Amino acid sequence: MRLCDTDIERYLDDGIIALTPRPSNDKINGATIDVRLGNSFRVFREHSAPYIDLSGPKEQVSAQLESVMSEEILIGENDAFFLHPGELALATTLESVKLPANIIGWLDGRSSLARLGLMVHVTAHRIDPGWEGRIVLEFFNSGKLPLALRPNMVIGALSFEILSGYAARPYSSRKNAKYKNQQSAVASRIDEDK
């Protein structure tokens, strides 16, 4: 069952779901809560790697990933990050999210941004039960013009569903959880897959 706005407010008030900083109640609508853009970004830098062999030896994949991803880019509160047509970038939500083991979250982009060609998440929009940390966004500009993205702008909306029970292996308790407690735009850690 997906939570409605009054349930989202109650779950936030009771500490069952936590968003830090907590959005005001006017950011909770129908069945979603707005989330804002943080100030941490990563981009693909100019590189000479012809490809990334996703099923190759872990050390090779790790070295290839390291060669193509930038260091973390932090921008000021009043600055803009420009995403050009055809570019992919990673960013984070301003809010850190904490979910219990019996609730799953979903991130959706905003229709108004999609109509300009901005995809907020390429495929990863599920927030696992037991998640704790900021949400990394996989931005892609499929439009024709560069887009100026600024910290604190509303970038998407979260919705929540109650599971049929408590997950036996929530994200926060898994030893192999690659993105546990992430607070910045963490690059792919596919080389850590088992």
Curated annotation (Swiss-Prot):
InterPro entries: dCTP_deaminase, dUTPase-like_sf, dUTPase_trimeric
Pfam families in the record: DCD
Pathway per the UniProt entry: Pyrimidine metabolism; dUMP biosynthesis; dUMP from dCTP (dUTP route): step 1/2
Domain of life: Bacteria
GO BP term, pick one: dUMP biosynthetic process
Binding residue positions for dCTP: 110-115, 128, 136-138, 171, 178, 182
Active site: 138 (proton donor/acceptor)
Disulfide pairings: none
Alphabetical UniProt keywords: Hydrolase, Nucleotide metabolism, Nucleotide-binding
Keyword Nucleotide-binding (UniProt): yes
A single GO molecular function term of this UniProt record: dCTP deaminase activity
Known EC number: 3.5.4.13
Enzyme class, broadest EC rank: hydrolase
Subunit and interaction comment: Homotrimer.
NCBIfam families in the record: dCTP_deam
Family: Belongs to the dCTP deaminase family.
Role: Catalyzes the deamination of dCTP to dUTP.
Designated name of the protein: dCTP deaminase
